[in-house]
Amino acid sequence: DWDKVIAVNLKGTFLVTQAAGQALVSSGCSGSIINISSIVGKVGNMGQTNYAASKAGVIGLTQTAARELGRHGIRCNSVLPGFIATPMTQKVPQKVMNKITGMIPMGHLGDPEDVADVVAFLASEDSGYITGAS
């Protein structure tokens, strides 16, 4: 359902980004806002128009927030995972998974820990000059 996907993926991300940004600005603290998008938001995917549009919106939202909040020392980045081994991907038929993994340069799905490591890096001071990245 178009409206539900947009409400959860895009509006939900907007509301959390807005609240975090306002809280950080009003406290005078610097910080890092990290939004989760998807590679589908960048390259699209058959049968996922609503999902692709919502995740592309997250990318644009994050890049704009980075520009607006940077002067306050607040970094905003988005992570665009590809196909990750989750309960959702376990439901995909094996024939389809074979086709998907054949298109992945590494030849296999990523693990949730792969995404978590990127998020942890972006949240740390080690990424202190990275903002607006996807």
Swiss-Prot record:
The active site is at 51 (proton acceptor). Pfam families: adh_short_C2 (PF13561). It is found in: Mitochondrion matrix. It comes from the Eukaryota. The modification N6-succinyllysine is found at residues 42, 55. GO terms for cellular component: mitochondrial matrix. InterPro entries: NAD(P)-bd_dom_sf, Sc_DH/Rdtase_CS, SDR_fam. The keyword Amino-acid biosynthesis does not apply. Its EC number is 1.1.1.62, 1.1.1.-, 1.1.1.239. GO terms for molecular function: (3R)-hydroxyacyl-CoA dehydrogenase (NAD+) activity; estradiol 17-beta-dehydrogenase [NAD(P)+] activity; NADH binding; quinone binding; testosterone dehydrogenase (NAD+) activity. Pathway: Steroid biosynthesis; estrogen biosynthesis; Lipid metabolism; fatty acid biosynthesis. Transmembrane segments: none annotated. One of its GO terms (biological process) is fatty acid biosynthetic process. Coiled coil: none annotated. Belongs to the short-chain dehydrogenases/reductases (SDR) family. NAD-dependent 17-beta-hydroxysteroid dehydrogenase with highest activity towards estradiol. Has very low activity towards testosterone. The heterotetramer with CBR4 has NADH-dependent 3-ketoacyl-acyl carrier protein reductase activity, and thereby plays a role in mitochondrial fatty acid biosynthesis. Within the heterotetramer, HSD17B8 binds NADH; CBR4 binds NADPD. Heterotetramer with CBR4; contains two molecules of HSD17B8 and CBR4. This is Estradiol 17-beta-dehydrogenase 8. The lineage of its organism: Eukaryota, Metazoa, Chordata, Craniata, Vertebrata. The gene is HSD17B8.
